[in-house]
């Protein structure tokens, strides 16, 4: 028996053990002051340590989160406190991710108190030539949401995708993606529907495109999105385009945002390959 590593949190230890089980490697956990992970077949030590290094780089990667389901067991025998909800949020979200979430919530509350129209007069895309130099308007349309479902859906994806980008690639990269996608998706959407629109979905689609393509072309970046989710995003765009659900969707912003994210991921992955 060879001890591979120790984890302070038993759930993290179990996630790694479950993932290795899906790879055909059996590990066991012994509880002492920490959760010690042991390997019976020492000939596999080098492989396990290599997988451990990748796991420690991004333990929140979906492939690890899904491993417990694939392993097919829930009775681990572990006894530990669950992560508090806000602790789980903090673990994945950096400062930029948090600032955007708080800003969207504050604006949403203001819209409930003051009314949509009053807030849009201050934050909407320039709706009059005299407003074209109020530069914040080219970005603040992304902060406005018109229903609870609208804001919850967008902020969930923003936290999941934006948090991953910020944690792995830095706050600067998330800021650049956000500003460019908000600007260009807003420009396209106002050509489709005029200036009266809002929501973070253009930025969310940019992040979907970016995380998926960057993960496909540059796995070492540490970000990853399952192909099934990007297919879902494309189906949602098609459904919105043909009004299959009878909901008002910012189709122009969705398409433009996705295109921006894919383009930025393509350029960044090319640059990453050149540096190798």
UniProtKB/Swiss-Prot annotation:
Catalytic residues, chain numbering: 201, 254
Catalytic activity: Cleaves type-1 transmembrane domains using a catalytic dyad composed of serine and histidine that are contributed by different transmembrane domains
One Gene Ontology MF term: serine-type endopeptidase activity
Transmembrane regions listed in the UniProt entry: 94-114, 142-162, 169-189, 192-212, 229-249, 250-270
A Pfam family recorded for this sequence: Rhomboid
UniProt membrane topology term: Multi-pass membrane protein
Gene Ontology biological process: proteolysis
EC number: 3.4.21.105
A GO cellular component annotation in the UniProt record: plasma membrane
Keywords: Cell inner membrane, Cell membrane, Hydrolase, Membrane, Protease, Serine protease, Transmembrane, Transmembrane helix
Major location (coarse): membrane
EC class of the enzyme, as a word: hydrolase
Places the protein is found: Cell inner membrane
The keyword Transmembrane is annotated on this UniProt entry: yes
Function statement: Rhomboid-type serine protease that catalyzes intramembrane proteolysis.
NCBIfam families per UniProt: PRK10907.1, rhombo_GlpG
Entries under HAMAP family matching the protein: Rhomboid_GlpG
Family: Belongs to the peptidase S54 family.
The protein's name in its UniProt record: Rhomboid protease GlpG
Naturally occurring in which organism (per UniProt): Escherichia fergusonii (strain ATCC 35469 / DSM 13698 / CCUG 18766 / IAM 14443 / JCM 21226 / LMG 7866 / NBRC 102419 / NCTC 12128 / CDC 0568-73)
Lineage: Bacteria, Pseudomonadati, Pseudomonadota, Gammaproteobacteria, Enterobacterales
């Amino acid at each position: 028996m060879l001890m591979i590593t120790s984890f302070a949190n038993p759930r993290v230890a179990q996630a790694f053990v479950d993932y290795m089980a899906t790879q055909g490697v059996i590990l066991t956990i012994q509880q002492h002051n920490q959760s010690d992970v042991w390997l019976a077949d020492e000939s596999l030590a080098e492989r396990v340590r290599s997988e451990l290094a990748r796991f420690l780089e991004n333990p929140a990667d979906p492939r690890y989160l899904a491993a417990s389901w694939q392993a097919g067991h829930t009775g681990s025998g572990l006894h530990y406190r669950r992560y508090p909800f806000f602790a789980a949020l903090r673990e994945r979200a950096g400062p930029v991710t948090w600032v955007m979430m708080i800003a969207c919530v504050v604006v949403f509350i203001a819209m409930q108190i003051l009314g949509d129209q009053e807030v849009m007069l201050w934050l909407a895309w320039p709706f009059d030539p005299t407003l074209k130099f109020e530069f914040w308007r080219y970005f603040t349309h992304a902060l406005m949401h018109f229903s609870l479902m609208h804001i919850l859906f967008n902020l969930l994806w923003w936290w999941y995708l934006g948090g991953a980008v910020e944690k792995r690639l830095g706050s600067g990269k998330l800021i650049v993606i956000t500003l460019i996608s908000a600007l260009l998706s807003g420009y396209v959407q106002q050509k489709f529907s005029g200036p009266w629109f809002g929501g973070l979905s253009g930025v969310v689609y940019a992040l979907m495109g970016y995380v998926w393509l960057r993960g496909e072309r540059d796995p070492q970046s540490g970000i990853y999105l399952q192909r099934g989710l990007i297919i879902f995003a494309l189906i949602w765009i098609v459904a919105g385009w043909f009004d299959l659900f009878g909901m008002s969707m910012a189709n122009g912003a969705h398409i433009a945002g996705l295109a921006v994210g894919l383009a930025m991921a393509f350029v960044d992955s090319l640059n990453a390959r050149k540096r190798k």
